[in-house]
Structures are given as C-alpha cells and as structure tokens.
Amino acid sequence: ALAKIHHSNKIRVVMLDEGVIGEYRVRDLKPLAARFGEQIIDAKGISTLPEETRKTLISSNVKIRENGISLLLNPATAYYSSRLAGEREKTVESAIQLKEKLGRPISVADPYCGVGPAVVQLLAQQGLVGDLLATDINPEAIIMLKRNLGEIKESWHCKATDALKLNQNPKLLGRFDLLLMNLPHSTLQHLSQLLPLLKTNAPTLLRGWYIVEEEEIPSAEAEFTNIIRQTQTLNSNFKLEIRRQFNTTKVLTRFECRFGDW
C-alpha cells in the first residue's frame, strides 16, 4: 500500500476491499495508507489521528466518469457497479426511441436507483425526461443521488423508499412511461408490485435485469410472461437475453418489453 501511494501523487488513500456486506451490499473498506499533508502514513498512523481528521482523510467519496457523465459515489455507503454501464447506455437509446414515439418528454421510474447512474444519464439528454421517480431503500444512496441530480423538480419523487411500498401511493399508479427493474437477484419476485406504475393507455417500456441459473431460463421466461400479462399486453414473446456469466452456473440476463402500439 505504501509503495502504491508513493508511486502516484494522485492517490489520496489506499483501501483494502474485504467484499460486500449488509443488506445494502456496500463495500467493506479498510484504510491501508493515506496522504496526510507532506507525509504518507500507514494504517497505524491513520488510527492515531483525531476522529474528524481521520474521517476526512479516509473518506471513500469518489467522482467517476461513466458514458460521458460525472457521478459522485461512495462504495462504502451505497452500492454501485460499473458492470452495467453498457446496459445503461442502451437504456438511453431505448428511452429516446420511446420519446420519439410519444412525441414528448417521457416519465421515468427507477425504483432501485442507487446513486443515480441510470437516471443521470437519461437526464443528460436534452428534453428526454419530464417526470421522474428515483427511489432506493438505502438512505445514503439517496443523499448521493440528490448530489448527482443537482436541481430536483418539486413534482419528482426522489426519496428513500422501499420499492415494494410504491404501489400503495395512488399518485404513482399509471404515471410512468418507462420502468427500470434493476434488482437482478429479486426482479422476478418484485415485478408484479412495480408494474402498476406504468401507464396502460399509451406506448410504454419495461427494461430489467435478472440473475438466474442458465438451465432455468425457459421456466423463468414463462413466469415473467404470466406476471406481465396480469396488467399489460405483450407485443412479442418475453425473452431473457444472456449478458454475461455471473458465476459457474448463473447468468445475468436482460429483458426489454414494449407495450402498446410501437
């Protein structure tokens, strides 16, 4: 760690990543070395600093670039994965097509928004988004989201919320043109609770991701189809597209459903 930080003046702190912890799936980071004024101190030196100084010194707030936009994130307090960056780029492409079909800015619901990588990229497109729901069960993620969004319209719904309780708010039902389902381990279990957020009288779009045993894809597709048909009419057969291997037996899949006349 000391060698790494000596090697580059741009490195402020070196952390040991001990993996994902807790229900919010944040990173367990331990400081190994940090730049303190003109000195470089190790973990023992860091531990002797006053608490406020130590907190500032080893803060894991970091700004990154993804698909041309800046994002503030903190992996120790809110989940973020760069692995879906390409998928978020494709979400923008599909959203633009929906806007062109409707001839107006679209209303977007992202119930598992995290620090906002998907919605920030949608908002970066001039005139693409009108109404917005961006929620997450992790309050720390919403704090970071609001910093990433900057100006937030009064009509937008941006707060720490359990996604499964959104359908209890009548003002949110049938309000959105685009629904993002980015909770890959639980998408199948949650979808029926979130579909009522979509409009039913105009073209709409559902995009989501799901982690599944590869051999169980056909049965999962049948389950998704049954859930969707309870509130929407499918324009084509539901299909889970494999995006990448998740582990030795499971894969990350993507689905996109277009409802209505388009």
Regions found by a protein language model. Give the residues of each.
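SAM-dependent transferase fold signal centered on methyltransferase-like domains
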Residues: 1-262
